[in-house]
Amino acid sequence: YLIDPSVNNLSPTEAISLGLGLIFGGLFVYEMACRSPLAKYPLLFGLCLVALICAVTFLSTQWFSGRGAYIHVGALIGTIMAGNVFFNIMPNQRKMVAAVAQKGDIDPQWGAGAKLRSVHNNYFTLPLLFIMISNHYPMTYQHEYNWLVLIAIMANAAWIRHFFNLRHVGKTKPAILVSGAIGMLLIALAVSWPSSQSVSVEKSEHGDQALAVV
């Protein structure tokens, strides 16, 4: 299901190479950004991260089948999340615990770096959950604008997650949840609505069948 000749006639070797390059290349860019001065500006960093995910989503749909593209975007997000936990959040926590036990100084960067990555993981959760079950919703990855559909779903999912994050700190904003739900409903209607291309093809097929009968 990775290769779709109608999208890009890749050989298995080319498809695998592009897939691995997309995942580990995206991870490399993310890691470099986390270690750069950009990490000091969370909002700007977040916008750059959104741009990265959007670019990966678009490129993957130009290279692979819709199904394969969605899975590769999910693989990148999942790899970033796992790397954040195992190579930054947990090690930094151990350093802080060890420093407290030894009554030493705690480097503020340990907590700042772990918090930044933890926030990213938090907002990645719902988008990744959708990608994990997206195989059951072919109307999304088979859509003419499947890359835009996935971006819209991920953005809405992250927006809904924002509602729960605010509620955890005592701020309840129902408008966020309602607007997120409306957004999801509109996306569902959009992907369920037959495209003009499919309608014209269907009419053509019916016409051919009628001519054959005549």
Where are these regions (language model features)?
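Sequence/structural segment immediately N-terminal to covalent heme-attachment motifs in c-type
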Residues: 206-214
